[in-house]
């Protein structure tokens, strides 16, 4: 038993030798003592070893069908996009796990098979699930995930964010574990906003358009980038973090408004016009056209050929109709209606949306043109006063939201606890 001094009663840690006065806690075992500092150190060592061995083996990598089914649990519709993403993600991480990077040391230079990275371009209107698809994939695979807005980026040397800041977000998402970040997923949104202003190269410098595309080329393709840990160029003497982007999967998304007209010119299809009667049909035809997109269409839109070449897989998502929005509100595992019902349940109150109320929320989102992204804002508006009042009242058992509440601003129906008790006992 570890003691200090002749016949002294002061105990000390059997590992670091610190006395019980020098540490916060000393835990006793059979003839041995360990202090809280040594326990923390042991935990750090174990966590480090576990994280090093936590990489998914090829056998554990979910198959495309499993990835598709997982996406189905969270994302409504967009079947073709989900299938394309499932295959692309499976092939990407299969390549990572098998170490099939260019010039692998396992074979001679003549035998090596170079498996190129398949980054993904997702095209479709806002609020249709482009970002959410990428987020859900990252959650399933338990890899770091970061979102960047292309409109905030400028090429190096100009006011704005450097493209390296995208990598910094991923490193931060991985708790500064660079090795973990090197197998993460980055979603770059609004990529259509950095399209070249004209199809022909401009004499003037396009620092937020073509310049950004040029700056993104290397990190998307795969390079060792130097990332400033504090971001930006404000700290010139900071040490840079080195990160290899070879195994980072880039998912790039954008609405690409007007791209359907470019595709239409190529395939020789005539537009229907924009009268009220044919608008719905015209929208459906526009979605069909987006599914036929080719690299040359994207070049005409304003993406440079080198950038398009780094995004070999193109998936399109379609505009959500009322039925799809109703499903989004009610069906997924973490559907919005279920989320708000859970919030009310925590206050001991039952929340009920009538079927026509849910349809009204979907109609409202369609009118605003916000897609699925605007659903939460509408529900927040509808429930604001109730969420303000109900927690302070202990007499409310149930809140019922009807179509009139959503469309006309009528107050939701509040059912007192006594009425609910009588109904159950009857």
From Swiss-Prot:
Keywords: ATP-binding, Chaperone, Metal-binding, Nucleotide-binding, Zinc. It holds the Pfam family ClpB_D2-small. PROSITE patterns: CLPX_ZB. The keyword Cytoplasm does not apply. Residues 1-54 form the ClpX-type ZB domain. One of its GO terms (biological process) is proteolysis involved in protein catabolic process. One of its GO terms (cellular component) is HslUV protease complex. CDD domains: RecA-like_ClpX. SMART domains: AAA, ClpB_D2-small, zf-C4_ClpX. ATP binds at residues 125-132. Zn(2+) binds at residues 13, 16, 35, 38. GO terms for molecular function: ATP binding; ATP hydrolysis activity; ATP-dependent protein folding chaperone; protein dimerization activity; unfolded protein binding; zinc ion binding. It comes from the Bacteria. ATP-dependent specificity component of the Clp protease. It directs the protease to specific substrates. Can perform chaperone functions in the absence of ClpP. Belongs to the ClpX chaperone family. Component of the ClpX-ClpP complex. Forms a hexameric ring that, in the presence of ATP, binds to fourteen ClpP subunits assembled into a disk-like structure with a central cavity, resembling the structure of eukaryotic proteasomes. This is ATP-dependent Clp protease ATP-binding subunit ClpX. The gene is clpX.
